[in-house]
Amino acid sequence: MTKTAVITGSTSGIGLAIARTLAKAGANIVLNGFGAPDEIRTVTDEVAGLSSGTVLHHPADMTKPSEIADMMAMVADRFGGADILVNNAGVQFVEKIEDFPVEQWDRIIAVNLSSSFHTIRGAIPPMKKKGWGRIINIASAHGLVASPFKSAYVAAKHGIMGLTKTVALEVAESGVTVNSICPGYVLTPLVEKQIPDQARTRGITEEQVINEVMLKGQPTKKFITVEQVASLALYLAGDDAAQITGTHVSMDGGWTAQ
């Protein structure tokens, strides 16, 4: 039977790479994310060309619970619910705590943490009914450790780790697994945007941000690729990972081993 995968924040970066990989494996794909209409159409058509199943896009804003509920209801009506849920949507803002805008805190917590609560809440009932499901939360090395100037992001990602463990325990006997992937620095549009932001905040050059801030903490001195994260997600979405639940897998070039 063809599985249906819902991937939030999947019009670029890690989410798009996961969508491509699951599409190649034959899954129906529900994309989600912002972009100009032409860009969304191009991405949807590209992913559709990789899958033998159905590929569509839902524009739910991850800061709006009603839109998330509408997306999950659409998936239930169209496909009988999500078999695979990948919570990947994420935003970032870098600033000293005393200057951190309240609206940015609220936005980051909403997108990076609360949206996962809402998608999981909608996904679990159909998964329980089927007796099978995979929930994969894209957390971060910042779900395990902290860095300066990222109070909201670090708080949200630590929250994702707690949410992952709690839900995994609640559904442990239902055939549903819940895990987190904790990447280090992956060269995505989100990370690329951080480079000039951190250069401004720290008063250093962009090259220094890359070499002395980002990759300094990764012993391999290399960015993780989106394809590497996607391959791990594919494994966690499969039957071979049925006994992996309530945990995280770090993919951080050795960052959190230090």
From Swiss-Prot:
Entry EC number(s): 1.1.1.30
UniProt GO BP: lipid metabolic process; monocarboxylic acid metabolic process
Binding site for NAD(+): 6-30
Highest taxon listed in the record's lineage: Bacteria
Catalytic residues (positions): Y153
UniProt GO MF annotations: 3-hydroxybutyrate dehydrogenase activity
Record InterPro entries: 3-OHbutyrate_DH, NAD(P)-bd_dom_sf, Sc_DH/Rdtase_CS, SDR, SDR_fam
PANTHER family recorded: 3-OXOACYL-(ACYL-CARRIER-PROTEIN) REDUCTASE, 3-OXOACYL-[ACYL-CARRIER-PROTEIN] REDUCTASE FABG
Official protein name in the record: D-beta-hydroxybutyrate dehydrogenase
Organism: Rhizobium meliloti (strain 1021)
The encoding gene: bdhA
